[in-house]
Design a protein with these regions (language model features):
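Surface-exposed coil/turn segments at beta-strand junctions on protein surfaces, enriched
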Residues: 1-2, 25
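A short, solvent-exposed beta-strand micro-motif common in secreted/extracellular proteins
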Residues: 2-12, 70
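Solvent-exposed coil/turn segments that connect beta secondary-structure elements
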Residues: 12-14, 39
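Short acidic/polar mixed-charge low-complexity motifs
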Residues: 14-16, 28, 205
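Edge beta-strands of extracellular beta-sandwich domains
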Residues: 16-23, 209
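Extracellular beta-sheet/turn segments enriched in Thr/Pro/Gly and aliphatic residues
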Residues: 22-42
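Catalytic cores of extracellular degradative/oxidative enzymes
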Residues: 45-220
């Protein structure tokens, strides 16, 4: 319809958000050109943006359309997590390890898993796996077996959702003392939550911070 419209465009954390207007007139074709201002170049300083918690299914490793989505957000490393429960897994990935990575123009998508995940012990995340590892139903609460297998494969493992949602603090208390946990996802949904991270640091445990969107489930309003 004829009128004045507001245009808003963004591209990740290194570009300023563009805001402008465009007038649409009757009987005319209106073209608009947007130019995003980059205010910092973190890769040139050795820092690369990433999202450790995405749920997106792909049928093939080199999924150009999916790669385009995350590249538009300027996410250099996107970890696509196969999501499990006691019965099955969802968002299954086509390949694992090096074969499960698709790198183009400095932006990569890779396979990982969020499994095991329960409301009794929290949700766990495992990156850089050579193959997925899903516990049988009668051992599903034995989280330590997945952490140990992840490390045997050269993986990196931790707890999602601030280490608090879905009773993740219970899992942290059980697994951190045995040096099984590499990180806690403390930044999500626009919130930084550290109350289940600092106590372990104060006790002398090495526990890295992580950030993940949990797309498409979490958002700034949650």
């Amino acid at each position: 319809p004829v009128g004045t419209y507001q245009l808003v465009a963004s591209k990740g954390p290194e570009y300023r958000v563009y805001q402008g207007t465009v007038d649409v007139r009757a009987g005319e074709t209106t073209d608009a050109t947007l130019k995003l201002e980059r205010y910092i170049d973190q890769p040139s300083r050795g820092w690369y943006s990433g999202d450790g918690h995405l749920h997106l299914m792909r049928d093939e490793t080199e999924d150009v359309t999916l790669w385009g989505y995350v590249t538009a957000e300027d996410i250099h490393v996107s970890n696509l997590l196969e999501m499990g429960n006691i019965v099955t897994t969802h968002y299954r990935q086509p390949a694992w390890g090096v074969e499960g990575r698709f790198l183009r123009d400095g932006h990569m998508i890779a396979s990982g898993q969020e499994d095991p995940r329960t409301t009794q012990r929290g949700h766990t995340i495992h990156h850089n796996l050579q193959r997925p590892f899903h516990l049988p139903a009668d051992r599903y609460f034995f989280y330590h077996e997945v952490f140990e297998e992840s490390h045997r494969q050269g993986g990196v493992s931790g707890y999602a959702h601030y280490g608090s949602s879905f009773n993740g603090r219970r899992g942290l208390v059980l697994d951190v003392p045995f040096d099984l946990v590499d990180f806690v996802e403390i930044l999500q949904g626009g919130r930084l939550v550290t109350n289940n991270w600092y106590p372990f640091l104060n006790l002398g445990f090495k526990l890295n911070p992580s950030a993940g969107s949990d797309f498409p489930y979490f958002g700034p309003s949650l």
